[in-house]
Structure formats: C-alpha cells, structure tokens
Amino acid sequence: MAAPGPVSPEAPFDPSKPPVIEGFSPTVYSNPEGFKEKFIRKTRENPMVPIGCLGTAAALTYGLYCFHRGQSHRSQLMMRTRIAAQGFTVVAILLGLAASAMKSQA
C-alpha cells in the first residue's frame, strides 16, 4: 500500500465570508411573510385542506352536541363522518405534496 503523498494546503477558511456552494446563491429575504399572508397563500395552493379541516371540526362539534343531548345514534354517525373528513384531509395533504413535488421537478 502506497503512502499518501503530501497534502497541498488549501486556502484557509475565512469566517467573514460565507463558503461557496455550487448551485446555491444566498439571497436576503427582505419581506417576511406573516401568518395571514402565509395562510392565504397556502389556502390558494391547496384549497381542499382547509375544507377538510372545517368539515372535520364541524362533524366533531355536531357529534359532541348530539352526545350531550343524548342522541347516541346521531353522535356515532357524526364520529364516523369525522373520521371520513379526516381521511379526506390527509388525502388532500398528500395530493398537494405530490403536486408540489412534481411542479418542482418540472
């Protein structure tokens, strides 16, 4: 086995300058996005997720109301509806992720 040759010293790291990374250009984001702006943008990108969340919350609220009133059959139906709405929301999230991944590849 051959002994490694002498290592040529590289330029020392200068902490005052960021390292150069190929394909990366640092930019300064001057306008940070607030909660309201981000919520509106995300809702426009994938409107089915908030719809699913509202459906889930509505089914849960009405199911608890029926449970409180003693309507156990209707309460059970609303809990099953809530599970379906949660499933719809998860599928909407996954489809939104898949669409954004395909958009970034193109």
From Swiss-Prot:
Record's bilayer topology term: Multi-pass membrane protein
Keywords: Acetylation, Electron transport, Membrane, Mitochondrion, Mitochondrion inner membrane, Transmembrane, Transmembrane helix, Transport
Domain of life: Eukaryota
PROSITE patterns recorded: HIG1
Record InterPro entries: Hypoxia_induced_domain (IPR007667), RCF1 (IPR050355)
GO biological process: mitochondrial respirasome assembly; negative regulation of apoptotic process; response to quercetin
GO cellular component: mitochondrial inner membrane; mitochondrion; nucleus
Localization per record: Mitochondrion membrane; Mitochondrion inner membrane
Residue span, HIG1 domain: 20-106
Listed transmembrane segments: 47-67, 83-103
Modified residues (N-acetylalanine): 2
Subunit structure: Associates with cytochrome c oxidase (COX, complex IV); proposed complex component.
Its job: Proposed subunit of cytochrome c oxidase (COX, complex IV), which is the terminal component of the mitochondrial respiratory chain that catalyzes the reduction of oxygen to water. May be involved in cytochrome c oxidase activity. May play a role in the assembly of respiratory supercomplexes.
Protein's recorded name: HIG1 domain family member 2A
Record organism: Mus musculus
